Design a protein with these regions (language model features):
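Conserved short acidic donor-positioning loop in nucleotide-sugar-dependent glycosyltransferases
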Residues: 92
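NAD(P)-dependent short-chain dehydrogenase/reductase
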Residues: 16-64, 68-72, 77, 103-105
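Short-chain dehydrogenase/reductase
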Residues: 31-32, 86-89
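Amphipathic terminal alpha-helices
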Residues: 133, 147-159
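Residue-level signal for the nucleotide or nucleotide-sugar donor/cofactor binding architecture
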Residues: 5, 38-41, 63-69, 95, ...
Length: 159
């Protein structure tokens, strides 16, 4: 059994219900948004582990990371100008989790060679990267915060 089904199937059913309700709607699917103040996300959880001297990740899948300020700007444009759509908000650039972990370690002054890659969770997607064609067309947004800069701001907020 894949534990992700318990998340993705109800989500898809809910989106379908809303889209067929006859009401005005805007469904925004956020992909790996990170930034200061967030909890329960890889970046924040890894920083906390590093503060405890634990330098490991679970799996080395790929993800696209979107800094919170970028997600807010895209959302603002979408909400003000569009309806009756389902839109992915995120960044197209895919990065291995180990690369992100090593960047975080470098920002924290920890030798990235200390990183240990452990087995990942059962059922975890090997890659998670949105198709951002529609959000770019609708918002014109292309000025993403560079990953290194967003990570630096996030890490500094957690130290």
């Amino acid at each position: 059994q894949n534990p992700r089904w318990s998340y993705s199937v109800p989500k898809a059913l809910g989106e379908n219900l809303v889209a067929n309700s006859g009401l005005e709607y805007l469904i925004i699917r956020y992909f790996n948004v990170y930034g200061p103040g967030q909890i329960d996300h890889f970046v924040n959880e890894f920083v906390e582990r590093c503060k405890q001297g634990e330098y490991y990740i679970k799996g080395d899948d790929t993800r696209s990371f979107c800094y919170v300020d970028d997600a807010v700007r895209m959302t603002d444009i979408l909400v003000r100008n569009h309806s009756n759509l389902t839109v992915n908000v995120g960044q197209q650039e895919e990065v291995k989790i180990s690369v992100v972990a090593k960047l975080i370690m470098g920002i924290m002054g920890v030798n990235p060679d200390k990183l240990e890659v452990r087995s990942g969770p059962v059922g975890s997607a090997k890659r998670r990267c949105p198709d951002t064609t529609l959000v770019k067309q609708l918002t014109g947004f292309t000025d993403y915060t560079p990953l290194q800069e967003g990570l630096r701001k996030t890490v500094e907020s957690l130290l």
